[in-house]
Amino acid sequence: MTARMDKRFAELKAEGRPALVTYFMGGDPDYDTSLGIMKALPEAGSDIIELGMPFSDPMADGPAIQLAGQRALKGGQTLKKTLQLAADFRKTDDATPIVMMGYYNPIYIYGVEKFLDDALTAGIDGLIVVDLPPEMDDELCIPAIRKGINFIRLATPTTDEKRLPAVLKNTSGFVYYVSMNGITGSALPDPSLVSGAVQRIKQHTELPVCVGFGVKTAEHAKVIGGSADGVVVGTAIVNQVATSLTKDGKATADTVQAVATLVRGLSSGTRSARLVAAE
């Protein structure tokens, strides 16, 4: 699998802290602004970037991310442009892992082999495709692994001991634990339940386990990061973009900086998480 992802988690383990994994929607609200956001994320403390692929029917996403996708699509964002976004980012940053996250339909239309080849060229390290279960691994997961691209699988509170081995079988990079049932942007989960779930997953895999859904503040990141290898934040970032826009959805001079300020705060949470847990 890609060395960039493995190296990043090894570095974080040596530092004794969890990763801050930040999600944003490619092309929201426009290409240039989203590239500015992407470049600002590592500088603000993001360790891994999740690059959202806008899609017209995002069934697992809450209202904030749905609206972000609509803004991106309205602005002309396509899967090809989202790959180009990663390629442009790689011109100045070859260290930060990039995971593309979204749905299978745009990839299928683009063409699986062409997509994987273009993703490799663009410097993509992993994929999260939320509507492809393990039973459909031959569609994209196995071809991605053969190309050397991590395929990151989701585990949920309803993933029981019988189901978990199938979920983990072809997973690489890290495991994304969805901390509650429902859509993105839900309330903060019970930290004790999250800790127990992470430990249960770790009994079956040596992969890092990152926790997402419901993390919005530095304190949330600190609490969840105390028991996980990574904390995923998406809705809070997408909301920060939205609140910085004009009434007609255009970027302002403050858009990129508003996101960077939020991420710096979240980073302070993850950077203190393991230190607190170790006391």
From Swiss-Prot:
Pathway recorded for this protein: Amino-acid biosynthesis; L-tryptophan biosynthesis; L-tryptophan from chorismate: step 5/5
Cellular component terms per the entry's GO annotation: cytosol
Keyword Amino-acid biosynthesis recorded: yes
Domain of life of the organism encoding this protein: Bacteria
Catalysis performed (reactions): (1S,2R)-1-C-(indol-3-yl)glycerol 3-phosphate + L-serine = D-glyceraldehyde 3-phosphate + L-tryptophan + H2O
InterPro entries to which the protein is assigned, alphabetical: Aldolase_TIM (IPR013785), RibuloseP-bd_barrel (IPR011060), Trp_synthase_alpha_AS (IPR018204), Trp_synthase_suA (IPR002028)
Active site feature: 50 (proton acceptor), 61 (proton acceptor)
Keyword annotations: Amino-acid biosynthesis, Aromatic amino acid biosynthesis, Lyase, Tryptophan biosynthesis
PROSITE patterns: TRP_SYNTHASE_ALPHA (PS00167)
EC number(s) given by UniProt: 4.2.1.20
Any one GO molecular function term: tryptophan synthase activity
Stated role: The alpha subunit is responsible for the aldol cleavage of indoleglycerol phosphate to indole and glyceraldehyde 3-phosphate.
Oligomeric and partner information: Tetramer of two alpha and two beta chains.
Stated family: Belongs to the TrpA family.
Protein name: Tryptophan synthase alpha chain
Gene that produces this protein: trpA
